[in-house]
Amino acid sequence: MYPHSKQKKTPVTLLALSIALALQAGAAAAQDAGAAATELDTVTVTGYRASVEKALDIKRGEAGMVDAVVAEDIGKFPDSNLAESLQRIPGVVITRDGGEGRQITVRGLGPDFTRVRINGMEALSTVGSSDGQGGTNRSRGFDFNVFASDLFSQLIARKTASADVEEGSLGATVDLRTARPFDYDGFTLVTNVQTAYNDASQAAMPRFAGLIANSWADGKVGALLSVAYSERETVEEGTGTVRWANARANTPTNTANPKGVGFAGCAEGTAPFPGVCSDQVYTPRFPRYTLMEHDQKRLGVTGSLQFKPSDRTTFSLDMLYSKIDAQRDEKYIEANGLSKTGADGKAQIVVRDGVIENGALVYAKMDNVDIRAENRHDEWSTDFYQVSLDGEHRLTDSFTLSGRVGTSRSKHDNPVQATIMMDKLDVQGYSYDYRGNANKPVFNYGVNPTDPNGWTLSTIRLRQNYVTNEFHNGELDFSWVIGPSFTLSGGVQGKNYSFDSMERRRVGNETAVPNFSTGNKIVPADMTELASLGGLAGSPGTWVVPNFGAIANSSVSSTAKGSTHWSTTRPACAASRSRTAAVG
């Protein structure tokens, strides 16, 4: 519940009250003219209004377009990470992954156009995700879900160019600042413990944040330590299409099929449903149900030491470490044949009935459709650290020197990304229907999706991803206040950036799968498991998928074509690597 207050002001009453107070003050001054003035204690106002005032002060002090979020806002709103804190800035939109904000878009420009500085030093952090959310990040887009929002005291988005901000951003330059001991008055201890319960995953999600700070030697030396830890278990249930494609993408020209128009029979002639042959008709590529289970743990630690030998000089040493560990399981059941352009895919499908709306085949009943069930398992982690030292010295009342030097490193490891697929070929009576609710279509697979018998192993996909980003920064600046309305600033900056990316894949064709011990590729029933949707109306509720553990321990794992061994932890792979270094 947000705090609120109601006030009613009557101008006449307030005027009368102010006149009365003025008369009393005049009388008191006449009676106590010789008395010494009494100094009152300082009254500090905190709360939402105070945080807004601080943000406005930041905006007033900048010549460009700047928006800010300060500590009071960050701490009092339940933002799980930095992206969700930044989305409260006008013009900032976030993308989500696993139920959390991941990247930001500023004024329509995507993550690649936004540059991020932490304590004044440019940095980059990357994570992995499902293919539908962008997969492993090898771009310059910053993944904010590496960091808990509790670790930062100030977020600033600079939306316009400025001479004192180096180039590299068309969208915005986002400045993140961690807390420092001199931000607090003496000894400070703050703790925050929260928990939530997710009824979809049936799991508690604890969250803890703590900060301790103190200063000594009459405020000349200070130290601070903050820690944030959280756990999340989420379940996502839904549907997808993996885009829509032209029904005649493979342009077959066979004669019309009198039993029904198939994608291989799109030609002149009379048929029960000829409309599907139009070049302007689109069909879903992978109409499917989706179940995603995402578990993650995130730890963040900041430390800061400050030294102020005089009123004119301040040194600050800031340290930041964050680690996120995640495990994701994705299970799908889909019509795979609609995406195939070969003879065993779209060309063999026969369309029995359909409905076209606005150029889309929103309902179709088909024969000879391949049905696919797949199971994907990911394990990944990202470690980020940054160390920076900065100092400021006022040589005179009008001339100030400042400088900083630091380094940062983000290391993303995805040692396990394994996908197993199995198909049921040439299924009769398959249908999909997007007419009632395009977000909740109804699929009828023509077979019992929970029956583990008759599935053919079709794909074993084993991949590993590793991405490392490093920054080394240094700068020296000066500021000279020439007059009340004129300040001259300048400086020099050096930056070195290096990028290392590697992807390893299973040797050979991923669709070249070996036989089981039975002598064929039919998946044994005891090497399958069930996936269930809990709350998606109109879905089959449960379907069968490959079982990772059972298949990895079977004869398939030791006879996969092109490799001598594969498992969900250390697949035999071919590697590709890229390196980039930049100096500025």
Regions found by a protein language model. Give the residues of each.
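Cleavable N-terminal targeting peptides that direct proteins into the secretory/outer-membrane pathway or into
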Residues: 1-38
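Extracytoplasmic beta-strand/coil segments of soluble accessory domains associated
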Residues: 83-130, 159
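Flexible glycine-rich, low-complexity coil/linker segments exposed to the extracellular/periplasmic environment
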Residues: 250-284, 346-369, 430-458, 513-584
